[in-house]
């Protein structure tokens, strides 16, 4: 039997997609009803920088995620947000600005598959990528991490990357979706 609480990670390939989605939605609502306020809050903050909090009494495992727009960045030992601990050896692909310049969606999907394989090997459930911010300023210090100033190209390449990673049963998280172009005061800007 399957140990998945919420259904198959490959649910999108099932012919009964809408029925499965309904069952999953019902199961999620029931699961959330059983959680305490502290448990719900704990899922929002995580166990540490790279792991969600598990809830053993409900069978909810801790989930590991790691950075990965162009390669798995998983640290050995205790994780820290500064990346001061030694990283696990992994493939490092060219940055997104270079891979997107290939205009090769099949190559990007293959890259995603390889990243998915590495996630499986390192017990990572979610890869934090791709980075899809649309380049608006040449002064953005993270432009190397973004695919293009063209939303069509970014969408096509990001979709291929996601398909590849998810084909291995690994979740993805598009990041820096919008408005991540500012360098001056980037860590303390007010939204007022």
Predicted stretch roles:
Residues 1-2, 7-23:
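Short, Lys/Arg-enriched N-terminal segments with co-localized hydrophobic residues
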Residues 18-192:
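Glycoside hydrolase catalytic-domain context in secreted enzymes
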């Amino acid at each position: 039997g399957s140990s998945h609480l919420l259904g198959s990670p490959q649910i999108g390939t099932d012919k009964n997609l809408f029925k499965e989605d309904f069952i999953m939605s019902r199961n999620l609502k029931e699961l959330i009803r059983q959680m305490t306020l502290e448990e719900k809050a704990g899922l929002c903050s995580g166990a540490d920088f790279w792991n969600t909090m598990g809830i053993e009494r409900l069978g909810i495992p801790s989930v590991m995620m790691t950075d990965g727009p162009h390669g798995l960045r998983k640290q050995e030992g205790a994780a820290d947000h500064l990346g001061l601990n030694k990283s696990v050896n992994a493939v490092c692909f060219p940055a997104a600005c270079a891979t997107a310049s290939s205009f090769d969606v099949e190559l990007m999907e293959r890259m995603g598959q390889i990243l998915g394989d590495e996630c499986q090997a390192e017990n990572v459930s979610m890869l934090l990528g791709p980075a899809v911010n649309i380049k608006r300023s040449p002064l953005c210090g993270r432009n190397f991490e973004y695919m293009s100033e063209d939303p069509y190209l970014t969408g096509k390449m990001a979709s291929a990357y996601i398909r590849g990673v998810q084909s291995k049963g690994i979740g993805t998280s598009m990041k820096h979706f919008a408005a991540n172009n500012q360098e001056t005061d980037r860590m303390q800007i007010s939204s007022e």
